[in-house]
Structure formats: structure tokens, C-alpha cells
Design a protein with these regions (language model features):
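Active-site cores of enzymes that catalyze phosphoryl transfer or operate on phosphate-rich substrates
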Residues: 102-202
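Well-ordered mid-protein domain cores that form the structural environment of catalytic cofactors
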Residues: 14-55
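Extended, regular secondary-structure scaffolds
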Residues: 43, 59-142
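Beta-propeller domains
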Residues: 10-14, 167
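Hydrophobic/aromatic-lined pockets within catalytic cores
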Residues: 58-62, 72, 163-166, 202
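Single conserved hydrophobic/aromatic residue that forms the stacking wall/gate
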Residues: 1-9
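Catalytic cores of large soluble enzymes that bind and process phosphate-bearing ligands
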Residues: 8-10, 41-45, 150, 202
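Short, well-ordered loop/turn elements at secondary-structure boundaries
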Residues: 36, 50-53, 58-63, 69, ...
């Protein structure tokens, strides 16, 4: 995904007008754009293709929703040291992101693992109950996908993960610190990075 501010101006075909207006006030639009971090949601081939699909749907005027994961470190930042490329984590959410809207009212519990138990109901139907599972709370964030020169705005909904319980005090009191923060670590692991280096055996 590209940076939101310049993208909106270009798609509404007002970029040059905004740039000229700011220049009259002694403000450089490019300097403002540089303050916005790139959404580090991953930049692989499939991710880029999905972004192009979303932009095309908006430009063609088709109403659409896209879904993805709100990776905290989806890409890396690079710099040159002693003539060599050095990769660093890109914490693009460190200072917040202005083109996303948190929607906690649409959170869902997502369950992992466990087992399913069948229960016979009085009306003869069978009810299936999942037990012994781990779960996280999925929280959506809306990002606008603006069509080109047509006043159409679709939505990319990216999902973050939060623990159902941030801290298990009972486990902590028993000296089991790892168990106390297990839920927190599970949520964090799901959204921390897009994928690890594939040079190592999983």
C-alpha cells in the first residue's frame, strides 16, 4: 500500500493545486508526505496484487471490502553502512497511523486448537462445542482505498490481535510467569511480522 496523503490528492486529481497552494505559504508538500510512514503490510507479489485489485475496484466504481492482517513489522527498513545494506525493523505504527480507524465494536473471538465435543439436544439435534482451545480477540482497523477521480472510497479492513486476558494473575501468583503472559504472546505472534527469514528450519 502506498502512503495515504499523496495518494488521496493524486486520485482526486488535486495534487498540483494542493502543492501550489502550500508553496504559496512556504510549505513543501513533499516534506509533509515524508512525515507519513509507509504502511508496512508486506510487499510480496501477492500482497501487491491484492492492493492493485482493491485500487482497481475503487477506480471502476465497484463497492468492495478487502481484508488483511495489521502486521506491526510487515517490512524492513534499510540503510547503508560501510557500503553494505543493513536491514532494520520498520516499526511503522510507532507513532500511530493517520489513515486508519480502529473499530473495536466489531471485534471477534478467534479460537485455536482444542477439541470438539458433541452434545445431543432435547429436540434431537446435535450441538458441537469447542473446548480446551486458545483464543485471541481480533480487532479491525479500516483503511480507505480511494478510486481515481470518481469520489468512490472502498475499505481495506486490516485485523490486529489482542489477548482475551492481558495477564493471568493467578498463574503469576503461582510463579508461572510464562503461563501468565501466554495469551499476550499468542496475540503478539500472530501480527508481529509478515513472515520470518526462510533460511532456518521452522
Amino acid at each position: 500500500m502506498s502512503r495515504g496523503l499523496g495518494d488521496v490528492y493524486k486520485r482526486q486529481t488535486v495534487y498540483n493545486e494542493v502543492k501550489e497552494a502550500l508553496e504559496e505559504m512556504g510549505i513543501n508538500l513533499n516534506a509533509i508526505e515524508d512525515q507519513e510512514p509507509d504502511p508496512a503490510l508486506g510487499n510480496g507479489g501477492l500482497g501487491r496484487l491484492a492492493a492493485c485489485f482493491m485500487e482497481s475496484l475503487a477506480t471502476l466504481g465497484y463497492p468492495a471490502y478487502g481484508c488483511g492482517i495489521r502486521y506491526h513489522y510487515g517490512m524492513f527498513r534499510q540503510k547503508i553502512e560501510n557500503g553494505y545494506q543493513v536491514e532494520e525493523p520498520d516499526n511503522w505504527l510507532q507513532n500511530g497511523y493517520p489513515f486508519e480507524l480502529k473499530r473495536p465494536e466489531y471485534n471477534f473471538e478467534v479460537k485455536f486448537g482444542g477439541y470438539v465435543r458433541a452434545e445431543a439436544q432435547p429436540d434431537g439435534r446435535t450441538r458441537f462445542v469447542q473446548e480446551g482451545y486458545q483464543s485471541v480477540k481480533a480487532i479491525p482497523y479500516d483503511m480507505p482505498i480511494v478510486g481515481y477521480n470518481n469520489n468512490v472510497v472502498n475499505t481495506l479492513m486490516i485485523w490486529d490481535a489482542e489477548p482475551m486476558e492481558c495477564f493471568e494473575l493467578d498463574s503469576f501468583d503461582k510463579g508461572d510467569y510464562h503461563r501468565a503472559i501466554e495469551q499476550q504472546n499468542l496475540a503478539k505472534n500472530l501480527v508481529e511480522v509478515l513472515y520470518p527469514n526462510d533460511n532456518h528450519i521452522a
